Swiss-Prot record:
The protein, known as: Probable xyloglucan endotransglucosylase/hydrolase protein 12
Induction line: Strongly down-regulated by abscisic acid (ABA).
The keyword Amino-acid biosynthesis belongs to this UniProt entry's keyword annotation: no
Residues that coordinate or bind xyloglucan: 105, 118-120, 128-130, 194-195, 199, 273
Source organism: Arabidopsis thaliana (Mouse-ear cress)
Gene: XTH12
Reactions performed catalytically: breaks a beta-(1->4) bond in the backbone of a xyloglucan and transfers the xyloglucanyl segment on to O-4 of the non-reducing terminal glucose residue of an acceptor, which can be a xyloglucan or an oligosaccharide of xyloglucan
Amino acid sequence: MAAFATKQSPLLLASLLILIGVATGSFYDSFDITWGAGRANIFESGQLLTCTLDKTSGSGFQSKKEYLFGKIDMKIKLVPGNSAGTVTAYYLSSKGETWDEIDFEFLGNVTGQPYVIHTNVFTGGKGNREMQFYLWFDPTADFHTYTVLWNPLNIIFLVDGIPIRVFKNNEANGVAYPKSQPMKIYSSLWEADDWATQGGKVKTDWTNAPFSASYRSFNDVDCCSRTSIWNWVTCNANSNSWMWTTLNSNQLGQLKWVQKDYMIYNYCTDFKRFPQGLPTECNLN
């Protein structure tokens, strides 16, 4: 292993949504820094955002808009060096006790050991759908693009355009799918050394603080979004758009490559965790 490693009715959608075709501008326009007491900052006229973590606090931000389906890109440069115990989270989530959520979490490690990408999908407040991966590059050396493509057919997680995971809409087989709760984008840098690195065996070395993750090139040009409950600004849901995208044959090959060579945990093969039987979708995918 590498070292661094049910289609909804268009009429229904149209009743909710209208057309957006412009790329997002600066981080000032798209996000609010929500916590961290000055540890998250925007630079370069809104083109760069950084989150920092020290022993006192981490930091985070969230999108101004909500999304109901979308193709959302963010370039992230992760915490370099000894990042053990740190988590850089980048995810979409709705509100309430029965929330939906689509997660990227980047689990730090000691110097020279690989980051872990932790992914999960929550529906109606229920998760337990973790898949974890190493990467085929050093994610701290430069910015790389992390994408969530979420439409009525599937949720696709991509890294630099390469799919690493697909969660399909299997509602017809009794599997819940996030399709009705708008979500905001959230990101944060925080400490979780009780579980994040090697199951909590390696703790955060605070002599390396402050830790910092950087963000560029946020893009939500292909999305269904709203700025308030009464003001939907939305997407082109025609048959040729991202709204009905699934993996093509080349992407399926890429997915198989990643899952063969870089996947380190798959809930769908964890029989000890699910002694009464694997979740339904595991037998369908």
